[in-house]
Amino acid sequence: MISKQEKKLLVKKYGKNEKDTGNAFVQVALLTHDIEKLKPHFQANPKDFHSRRGFLAKITQRKTLLAYLKKNDPETYLKCLEEFKLRK
């Protein structure tokens, strides 16, 4: 889970202003940060299937947002892939 301070910093860094939480780029940034923080937990606890379900939901949500960006704003999509070092 992402703390309020971390979320505020990420929104300020990737958003147009500090209240721009609805921007798809900002949402991808928040989800990517959350996913990266959860990866070590699943490496240490491979049988934690209950939490894995929520983890996979976050990955799917990020994938959906990336598909939206690819369709509607390809320039931001490519920037997103480069910034967060994602494969596509």
Swiss-Prot record:
Instruction: Check the record and name the SMART domains matching this protein.
Output: Ribosomal_S15
- Answer whether the UniProt record assigns the keyword Nucleotide-binding to this protein: no
Entries under SUPFAM superfamilies matching the protein: S15/NS1 RNA-binding domain
The record's Gene Ontology cellular component field reads:
cytosolic small ribosomal subunit
Query: Which terms under GO biological process does the entry name?
Result: translation
Q: Which domain of life is it from?
A: Bacteria
Q: Which Pfam families match?
A: Ribosomal_S15
Record's InterPro entries?
Ribosomal_uS15, Ribosomal_uS15_bac-type, uS15_NS1_RNA-bd_sf
MF (Gene Ontology): rRNA binding; structural constituent of ribosome
CDD domains in alphabetical order: Ribosomal_S15p_S13e
Keyword terms: Ribonucleoprotein, Ribosomal protein, RNA-binding, rRNA-binding
Transmembrane segments annotated in the record for this chain: none
What's the stated role of this polypeptide? One of the primary rRNA binding proteins, it binds directly to 16S rRNA where it helps nucleate assembly of the platform of the 30S subunit by binding and bridging several RNA helices of the 16S rRNA.
The protein's matches in HAMAP family, at most eight in alphabetical order, are given as: Ribosomal_uS15_B
State the oligomer form and interacting partners: Part of the 30S ribosomal subunit. Forms a bridge to the 50S subunit in the 70S ribosome, contacting the 23S rRNA.
Q: Which family does it belong to?
A: Belongs to the universal ribosomal protein uS15 family.
Q: What is this protein called?
A: Small ribosomal subunit protein uS15
The lineage, from the top, is: Bacteria, Bacillati, Mycoplasmatota, Mycoplasmoidales, Metamycoplasmataceae
